[in-house]
């Protein structure tokens, strides 16, 4: 669940910048404007460039630390692609044990083929490495989704309702004891889904974030995550879907969601962005 949640949470809140048409006749300008409108706005966000990275810290029942880095960003008239590295540590606070360390590498493709079309995002054959106290997991994951993955260029007036989004995901992992190259079990979830409900825009206000005092606005929605049929070591395990109420605090000047609040079963977890930077030395 943590893998799918991490992947799904991050793209929202990116602010795109309009691509200006080049010189030439009216027809050329119109064509350039049409291409710019059709491109996924996320690709033109000021932070969407090679070497950019974001650091997030979460509290609550599952404390976590997440660092995401973009590499090898390439743009096209209808979108972009990039390598996304996700390094995370997470743990159940009640267990008081060492964290689970997870490393993911995704080749992400973002497209919008027409101005009226939904933005799509896809990653195939992502490499997953995870390590816990007694075991490690290695394998592949994939996800595909359509909908609103960023808040750029949208009508964010108070009271506005934005459309949601749908993700389908799959993961196939082998489980190894630490220090051994012989797999002792497997885990497969081929029909996992994440449904994001309609988003409701709140009032722009000042917010004390871990990056300082910022102007931000709350955007709230319900999120339902289902692993679908889960196979562990050849045994079918049914996992109940989880439903969460989420509030993104989107800060336009930073073009990013600097805080996310997740409420589930009367418990609230907060995930804060602590750094949003570009490494000019990165490829």
Residue ranges and their predicted role:
Residues 16-133, 176-283:
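Acidic, serine/threonine-rich low-complexity disordered tracts
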Residues 126-179, 186-189:
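Surface-exposed acidic loop/strand-edge motifs in secreted or periplasmic proteins
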Residues 1-8:
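Bacterial N-terminal signal peptides
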């Amino acid at each position: 669940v943590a893998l799918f949640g991490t992947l799904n949470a991050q793209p929202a809140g990116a602010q795109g910048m309009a691509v200006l048409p080049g010189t030439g006749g009216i027809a050329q300008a119109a064509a350039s404007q049409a291409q710019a409108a059709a491109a996924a706005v996320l690709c033109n966000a000021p932070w969407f460039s090679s070497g950019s990275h974001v650091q997030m810290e979460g509290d609550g029942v599952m404390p976590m630390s997440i660092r995401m880095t973009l590499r090898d960003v390439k743009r096209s008239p209808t979108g972009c692609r990039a390598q996304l590295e996700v390094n995370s540590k997470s743990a159940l606070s009640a267990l008081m044990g060492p964290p689970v360390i997870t490393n993911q590498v995704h080749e992400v493709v973002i497209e919008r083929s027409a101005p009226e079309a939904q933005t799509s995002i896809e990653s195939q054959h992502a490499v997953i490495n995870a390590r816990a106290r007694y075991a490690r997991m290695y394998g592949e994951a994939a996800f595909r989704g359509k909908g609103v993955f960023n808040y750029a260029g949208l009508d964010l007036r108070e009271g506005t309702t934005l459309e949601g989004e749908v993700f389908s995901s799959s993961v196939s992992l082998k489980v190894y004891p630490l220090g051994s190259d012989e797999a002792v079990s497997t885990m497969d979830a081929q029909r996992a889904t994440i449904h994001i409900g309609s988003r409701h825009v709140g009032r722009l206000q000042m917010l004390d974030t871990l990056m300082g005092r910022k102007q931000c606005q709350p955007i709230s929605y319900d999120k339902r995550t289902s692993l679908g049929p889960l196979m562990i070591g050849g045994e079918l395990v049914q996992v109940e879907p989880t439903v969460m109420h989420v509030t993104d605090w989107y800060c336009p000047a930073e073009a990013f969601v600097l805080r996310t609040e997740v409420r589930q079963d009367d418990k609230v977890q907060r995930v804060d962005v602590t750094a949003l930077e570009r490494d000019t030395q990165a490829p």
